[in-house]
């Protein structure tokens, strides 16, 4: 029977494979059904056919093309006209359907027209007869004519084509030239260039027959807003740009020019395929100057906006001009079809793009920054500088924007920010936004900024976790035999493939049943590396006691009493599923003879026993007999060592690095295992007597089991309480990782069981402290378990026979908890070694020197003494604990004051002995309480240490005592800060108070005599530690640390002696900072000897000396003339003097008690006034820094004028002198400043109200200098001065006035006009200038 030739589409339709028509035609280049003979199965699978579809295709192929010699002979004898020889398909491009609907639509359309669409035409057949073309409908109108859809009947094929009708009137070249160009166009074969089938020569028009693109042009698709979300996303546009560049690169290699590259000439064939059309059409039609230069109108669509300047000016079309057009095409794509240079005429476009003042299109909102950079390169004015298509094609793959996936929702939408949800895909447009945010675009086309930290990288191509079906496309099984039962292989060396376990350890499905087998050990395991209990068990407990979630309570409560098996079987216990270790992430419960167990992957990860080197594994409830044979004694039965020898609870962890055994070992038979179990149980129960109190323990054990059963919700359970655990998998339940908190009742029961186990233990805890190597466990030693010790990381057994004696019935301290709180007091006490013996002779000597003599050394307790705080001091007797200990907490201010008053009442004098520091108060630093500095109090001469006396070594502070750190180092001036005037006032007031107190004391009656011959020394910032610690002059003493003598410590008092007004206005920290600088910067001796510094010291010394003289002579402070003292100081001196004369002794002490913080008066009132003055001299003896300064100061003092000396010497006798006038005041100030070449801080404070204002200084004022710096060359000092005087010396407004005049210089605004203009716009300079002359800012 003969079969006629069948069309490819009809053949596929009959085979029900019509959906593969486009793929067969374009990918496999099959044009008729007979060519399926040469298509291999791999080729068909490549285009998506499944095996059943391939078999169906072969079946219908055999039907239409049987393999018989008769058919071959007939085929050879057929007419040549019916067998059209085809040549190879173009370019190997792939055109796949958009989806099933569009593919079926294309197929139905092809079936309707009864034609297929071959991608190849006969060679040299670019002239097509007019009668072979049938026009169906018009698709649109182009610049060169109309475009229609039709069918080309080529022999036995019908091809759907697009027909472009060109009017002869539009053609400016003769038909022969056009045919030459058409022949060139016909020879182009590329996957991204539309194929030209041929040309139809009609009488009135020319028709170009090309491929038909069902999805219209790219420009139409871009303008369709509905396609933005589903189709034309940014990644798709980037892929289209690469395909367009690929086609243009092909033309560039062929030395061909397109001349009209634009989005309207890019045709979309599928969701991922575009092709360039109308190649060379303008040249074929002979379009010349008129088309390009005279078609200037507002509605211009072609092609001025796409042409390079040289094309418009000189009609010079090159590949560089195509590159320019490619840049414009990219701009169209990323602007979604927006017309370039919209609303501009051709002449305006030429003016905009032509040099020298050329402009360029702005970056579209959805355009990635890299692509816009490429556009700017394509729009280089110099054609030679534009990149070539080959270079662009190499760059484009690396320019694709990165895609990110949002992991959180955008909760707070902001302006210009993306509003995205979790799971949205964001394409990055720009990373360099100048902000922490990136610019991106969603798949919806919305652009904005987003936080990149809320996203992760999105990779396409990764397999989805929610697959609808299990795909086996990659399986290349060639055999067509059906799958039969005998073809399913038996387990080969392993159960992995039956348990959904791959060779690499990857699993899917439920593999819990694998873990229930005792003999199968190849379930993948993983050691949890971030947490290793064996490494930090000594530092940190796994769980906080007394929670029963640790395995110790489990073992003691449920698994360590073999007598619980009433029927002779192995004792089966049910375990509460909440008993999982804290380090487990995914616990797997393995049923072992009815016993739930956790398995450690290796002994090194088990915190409850020492590491074992052997591979022998034993289950505690297998009850090995006395013969020593183990049912699992074969080596290699399990590749990991057992965590606890008799512990039935294995901590099972997943491990990737374990190597499975080479051969599957099923172990002994089930019958042998049961017999061995029975034998071991009978041997165990018959050979050992019951221990005392066993019944009580057993009852408690049963109660625990019952409570565990009641609380159990998930996990591997077994209810055969009496030990009928013969088949381990019969009572197994599905493993689960859920955790249920243990109830309070169960917790109490378990804790009670632990206490009972501790009470009946026959072993002492003292053995646990001894260092011993762990013994390899043997099968004979049943139920041997030990407490691990924190210092030992586990414990072994000293005697090998313990496992066979009473330990089988009475667990030897079955609590394996690593926590000390699990022990009772006796056990805890016995487990602690004798610290007295551990310390030794050297440690005891160090203890005595550091602890007992700490009053001298002033340190906290040693580490050994710290440890003693946790123990009973009755255990040992250290010989020097009789000394009174320093309190661990800071004493209160009230207690401190009471102690000091008691000392003063008893007339105590402090000496440098060992106990002098025990009752000393801990003072808070001054910066914690107040900002006023108390001048160093005078010290008794008998308390000053000898200069050659050794300085005690400072040691670390007491542990547990919160040390208040000193203030952080602040900005330090280059030159020392002179003590300001208010610091002077505080100093003088303290001296006055001290004089009052000294006058009150009966022991210092000789101290009232003045010291006129005392040399004037620098006492401004002298630190008392110079007297006490001459070897450490730079040590700072205003920390909260105990000192040798309280009198020698710096004290920073509150402003108790000042009036509220003084306290409010004079509380600065300048003097404090000066002292810190003096103490810290000991390397500035050269600077301190400079005239500036010595003058400052001199000035302050003069003030202090005269004040002392005036105070001792009982003169009014206001009569001190010629000195640099401000009004506030004079007023305060009056207050202090009146207080001294009018207030009795009792009122002074009452005044002190009124303040919240006492002044901590030193116990120096019993010392003579002579010693007070002499101690000031001794203050400088130990300070090397001030020694060097003293000489310079004294030299400066000797150089002072005779007039000032006489002025100061006349003060004591000038009690009746008149108050100083202002003229005298300024004269004295000028005289002082004449001899000084420094300006100190007090100068600035004093003359802050008296210095000349900026208006008085004129051009030299600071305001003018600032304005000149701000305005630069735009203004002069005189002009700035005029603006300042006009605006009443407001610098900011003056600057705006001059800037406004500069910005609107054409208007020649006056200051008045500028002021009014700025006033109207609320002094907004930019707005004012813009309103005045339209200036763009």
UniProtKB/Swiss-Prot annotation:
Region Disordered: start-end pairs: 714-739, 786-822, 906-969, 1024-1045
Residues where Phosphotyrosine is found: 291-292
Sequence positions that bind ATP: 139-147, 164
Location of the Protein kinase domain: 133-399
Domain of life the protein comes from: Eukaryota
Any GO MF annotation of the entry: ATP binding
EC number(s) stated in the UniProt entry for this protein: 2.7.10.2
Keyword Phosphoprotein belongs to the record: yes
Domain CRIB: 488-502
Feature: compositional bias, Pro residues: 947-957
Active-site residues, record numbering mapped to chain: 260
CDD domains: CRIB, PTKc_Ack_like, SAM_TNK-like
Pfam short name (any one): PBD
Stated role: Likely to act as a downstream effector of Cdc42 during dorsal closure, acting in a kinase independent manner with the other ACK family member Ack to positively regulate expression of the myosin zip by promoting the endocytosis of Egfr in the amnioserosa (AS).
Similarity section: Belongs to the protein kinase superfamily. Tyr protein kinase family.
PANTHER family xrefs: TYROSINE-PROTEIN KINASE
Name by which UniProt lists this protein: Activated Cdc42 kinase-like
Source organism per UniProt: Drosophila melanogaster (Fruit fly)
Source organism phylogeny: Eukaryota, Metazoa, Ecdysozoa, Arthropoda, Hexapoda
Gene expressing this chain: Ack-like
């Amino acid at each position: 029977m003969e079969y006629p030739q069948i069309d490819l589409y009809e053949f596929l339709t009959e085979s029900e494979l019509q959906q593969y028509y486009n793929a067969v035609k374009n990918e496999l280049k099959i044009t008729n059904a007979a060519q399926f003979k040469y298509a291999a199965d791999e080729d068909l699978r490549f285009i998506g056919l499944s095996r059943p579809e391939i078999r169906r295709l072969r079946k219908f192929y055999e039907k239409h093309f049987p393999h018989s010699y008769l058919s071959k002979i007939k085929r050879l004898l057929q007419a040549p006209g019916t067998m059209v020889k085809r040549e190879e398909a173009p370019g190997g491009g792939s055109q796949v359907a958009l989806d099933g609907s569009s593919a079926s639509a294309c197929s139905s359309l092809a079936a309707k027209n009864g034609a297929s669409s071959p991608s190849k035409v006969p060679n040299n057949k670019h002239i097509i007869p007019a009668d072979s073309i049938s026009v169906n409908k018009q698709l649109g109108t182009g610049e060169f004519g109309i475009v229609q859809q039709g069918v080309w009947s080529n022999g036995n094929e019908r091809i759907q084509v697009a027909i472009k009708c060109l009017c002869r009137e539009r053609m400016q070249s003769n038909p022969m030239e056009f045919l030459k160009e058409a022949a060139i166009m016909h020879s182009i074969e590329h996957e991204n260039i539309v194929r030209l089938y041929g040309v139809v020569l009609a009488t009135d028009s020319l028709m170009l027959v090309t491929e038909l693109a069902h999805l219209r042009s790219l420009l139409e698709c871009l303008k369709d807003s509905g396609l933005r979300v589903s189709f034309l996303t940014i990644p798709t546009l980037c892929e289209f740009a690469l395909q367009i560049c690929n086609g243009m690169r092909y033309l560039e290699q062929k030395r061909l020019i397109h001349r009209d590259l634009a989005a309207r000439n890019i045709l979309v064939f599928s969701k991922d395929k575009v092709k360039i059309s109308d190649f060379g059409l303008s040249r074929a039609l002979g379009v010349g100057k008129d088309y390009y230069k005279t078609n200037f109108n507002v509605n211009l669509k072609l092609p001025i906006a796409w042409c390079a300047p040289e094309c418009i000016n000189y009609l010079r079309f090159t590949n560089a001009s195509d590159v320019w057009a490619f840049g414009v095409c990219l701009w169209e794509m990323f602007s979604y079809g927006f017309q370039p240079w919209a609303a501009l005429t051709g002449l305006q476009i030429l003016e905009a793009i032509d040099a020298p003042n050329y402009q360029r299109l702005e970056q579209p909102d959805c355009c990635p920054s890299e692509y816009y950079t490429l556009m700017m390169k394509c729009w280089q004015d110099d054609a030679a500088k534009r990149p070539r298509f080959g270079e662009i094609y190499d760059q484009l793959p690396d320019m694709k924007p990165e895609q990110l996936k949002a992991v959180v929702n955008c909760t707070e939408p902001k302006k210009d920010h993306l509003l995205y949800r979790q799971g949205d895909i964001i394409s990055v447009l720009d990373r360099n936004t100048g902000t922490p945010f990136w610019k991106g675009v969603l798949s919806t086309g919305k652009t904005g900024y987003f936080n990149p930290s809320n996203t992760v990288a999105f990779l396409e191509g990764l397999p989805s976790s929610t697959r609808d079906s299990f795909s086996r496309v990659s399986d290349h099984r060639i055999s067509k035999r059906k799958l039969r039962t005998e073809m399913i292989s038996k387990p080969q060396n392993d159960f992995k493939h039956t348990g959904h376990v791959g060779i690499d350890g990857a699993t899917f499905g439920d593999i819990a049943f694998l873990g229930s087998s005792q003999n199968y050990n190849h379930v993948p395991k993983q050691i949890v590396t971030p947490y290793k209990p064996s490494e930090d068990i000594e530092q940190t407990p796994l769980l906080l006691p007394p929670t029963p979630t640790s395995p110790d309570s489990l073992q003691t409560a449920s698994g360590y009493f073999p007598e619980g098996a009433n029927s002779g079987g192995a004792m089966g216990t049910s375990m509460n599923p909440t008993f999982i270790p804290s380090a487990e992430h995914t616990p797997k419960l393995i049923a072992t003879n009815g016993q739930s167990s956790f398995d450690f992957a290796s002994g090194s990860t088990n915190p409850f026993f020492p590491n074992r080197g052997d591979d022998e594994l034993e289950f505690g409830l297998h009850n090995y007999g006395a013969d020593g044979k183990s049912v699992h004694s074969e080596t290699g039965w399990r590749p990991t060592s057992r965590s606890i020898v008799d512990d039935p609870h294995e901590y099972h962890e997943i491990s990737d690095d374990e190597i499975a055994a080479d051969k599957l070992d099923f172990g002994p038979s089930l019958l042998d295992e049961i017999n061995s179990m029975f034998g071991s149980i009978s041997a165990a129960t018959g050979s050992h007597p019951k221990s005392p109190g066993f019944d009580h323990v057993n009852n408690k054990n049963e109660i625990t089991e019952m409570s565990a059963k009641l609380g159990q919700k998930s996990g591997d359970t077994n209810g055969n309480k009496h030990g009928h655990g013969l088949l381990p998998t019969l009572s197994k339940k599905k493993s689960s990782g859920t955790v249920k908190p243990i109830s309070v009742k169960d917790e109490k029961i378990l804790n009670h069981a632990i206490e009972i186990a501790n009470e009946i233990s026959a072993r002492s805890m003292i053995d646990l402290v001894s260092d011993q190597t762990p013994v390899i466990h043997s099968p004979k030693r049943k139920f041997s378990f030990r407490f691990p010790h924190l210092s030992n990381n586990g414990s072994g057994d000293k005697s090998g026979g313990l496992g066979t004696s009473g330990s089988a019935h009475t667990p030897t301290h079955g609590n394996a908890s690593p926590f000390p709180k699990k022990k009772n007091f006796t056990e805890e006490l016995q487990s602690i070694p004798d610290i007295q013996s551990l310390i030794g002779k050297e440690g005891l000597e160090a203890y005595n020197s550091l602890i007992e003599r700490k009053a001298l050394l002033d340190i906290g307790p040693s580490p050994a003494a710290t440890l003693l705080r946790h123990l009973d001091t009755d255990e040992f007797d250290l010989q020097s604990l009789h000394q009174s200990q320093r309190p661990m907490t800071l004493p209160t201010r009230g207690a401190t004051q009471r102690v000091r008053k008691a000392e003063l009442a008893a007339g105590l004098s402090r000496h440098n002995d060992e106990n002098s520091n025990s009752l000393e108060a801990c003072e808070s630093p001054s910066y914690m309480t107040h900002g006023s500095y108390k001048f160093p109090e005078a010290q008794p001469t008998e308390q000053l240490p000898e200069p050659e006396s050794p300085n005690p070594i400072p040691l670390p502070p007491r542990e547990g005592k919160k040390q208040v750190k000193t203030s952080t180092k602040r900005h330090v001036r280059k030159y020392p800060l002179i003590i300001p005037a208010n610091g002077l006032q505080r100093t003088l007031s303290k001296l006055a108070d001290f004089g009052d107190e000294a006058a009150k004391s009966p022991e210092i009656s000789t101290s009232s005599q003045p010291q006129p011959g005392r040399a004037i020394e620098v006492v401004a910032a002298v630190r008392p530690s110079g007297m006490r610690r001459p070897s450490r002059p730079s040590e700072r003493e205003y920390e909260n640390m105990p000192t040798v003598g309280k009198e020698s410590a710096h004290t920073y008092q509150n402003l108790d002696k000042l009036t509220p007004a003084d306290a409010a206005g004079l509380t600065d920290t300048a003097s404090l900072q000066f002292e810190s600088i003096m103490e810290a910067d000991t390397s500035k001796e050269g600077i301190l000897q400079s005239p500036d510094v010595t003058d400052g010291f001199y000035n302050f010394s003069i003030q202090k000396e005269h004040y002392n003289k005036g105070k001792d002579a009982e003169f009014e402070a206001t009569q001190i003339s010629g000195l640099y003292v401000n009004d506030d100081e004079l007023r305060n001196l009056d207050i202090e003097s009146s207080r001294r004369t009018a207030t009795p002794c009792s009122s002074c002490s009452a005044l002190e008690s009124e303040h919240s913080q006492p002044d901590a008066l030193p116990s120096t009132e019993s010392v003579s006034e002579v010693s007070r003055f002499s101690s000031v001299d001794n203050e400088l003896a130990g300070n090397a820094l001030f020694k060097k300064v003293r000489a310079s100061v004294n030299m400066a003092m000797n150089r002072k004028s005779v007039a000032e000396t006489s002025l100061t010497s006349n003060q004591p006798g000038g009690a009746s002198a008149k108050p100083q006038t202002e003229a005298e005041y300024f004269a004295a100030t000028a005289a002082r400043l004449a001899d000084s070449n420094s300006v100190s801080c007090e100068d600035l404070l004093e003359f802050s109200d008296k210095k000349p204002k900026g208006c008085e200084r004129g051009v030299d004022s600071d305001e003018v200098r600032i304005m000149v710096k701000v305005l630069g060359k735009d203004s002069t000092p005189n002009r700035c001065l005029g603006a300042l005087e006009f605006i009443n010396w407001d610098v900011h407004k003056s600057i705006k006035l001059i800037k406004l005049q500069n910005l609107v210089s054409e208007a020649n605004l006056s200051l008045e006009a500028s002021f009014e203009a700025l006033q109207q716009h609320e002094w907004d300079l930019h707005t004012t200038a813009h309103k005045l002359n339209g200036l763009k800012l």
